[in-house]
Amino acid sequence: MTILTSSRRRALSAGAASVAALALPRIARAQAQVVRIGVPTKTYYPTIIAETAIRQKLFAKEGIQAELTIYRGGAEGYEALAAGAADVIMNSPSSVSAGLKKGVMAKNVAGTALGYYGWHLVVKTNSPIKDVKELADKKVGITSAGSGTDILALWAQADRKVHFTRVPLGGGGLVPNLLSGNLDATVLYSPLTYKMFIDKTARSLIDFGEAVPPHLTGAWIATDRFIKEQPQVLQSTLNALYGGLIFLQNPAHRAEAVKLIAEIDEIPPNIAEAELDSNIVKLSKDGAIENEWMVRALDMARLIGMTDLASAEESYTTSFKPVPTV
């Protein structure tokens, strides 16, 4: 299976561990465990969380090194997981259920969100399109087939009874192609939505956070092999990731959180504030996954045409409960 390489990959050993390692024999330093983490696109909350955990040296506190890969969509990230090029990825929970039917043995191990906070179907501000039904036979941007943007595009078609052409462009291609007129609309996620709204370059046709019924919309995912062979590394990885999230959500860290989000996403502070207040603070603090949430996620997937799915019970494990690193 061919893996499309990410535009950015960093092997990061957090500073506290690095400093401590200077006093250790070279052979001991060479044995540090590396965990390969994949996220679906750059300007997206799992990237913010993972980068924050790295910058706060939380992986080092757990005794591991994090190698972060930013892919060009959820489908590419899942392909990497299937090929053994990633240990842990963030993706839509239903991707696990679909993958199981294709022989990709993996599980959702920790939930991230119960809604598409900050996700919208948008058009340019000066677009003549005022209603979703006016997108009939038009071009609508998504990151990749099978991604969260694809699921929401298909949901919009089913819910509003309209058909349009879904155009996969990767996370970095959505905004430029919308603004250039190559797209009539696009499914977009925060903080890109907030930036475009504040800049008055786009307006919303659908607020998916309000329109779509609540269900498990995101999860950290690991292969069965990684779960079985390296459970403590997986536990440590989740501890660090949720430590990063809790750091961002803590009101005492608000100024630093806004600064981190602005730096990581390369956005102005006012847009970083919108991302923090309207999205990050709403994310799951404990990584819980309940069967009812997973069932609803699969119902959502079936609604948009994903029919060959493993059961909810087969698609997740509750064996790992994040203990946020501080």
Segments the model singles out, each with a brief description of its role:
Residues 298-326:
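Conserved C-terminal helix/tail region of periplasmic/extracytoplasmic solute-binding proteins
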Residues 94, 172-261:
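Pocket-lining segment of extracytoplasmic ligand-binding domains
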Residues 10-30:
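N-terminal export signals
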Residues 56, 62, 80, 84, ...:
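Structured segments of extracytoplasmic/periplasmic soluble domains
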Residues 57, 61, 210-212, 281-290:
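Short, solvent-exposed loop/beta-turn-alpha elements that line the ligand-binding surface or hinge
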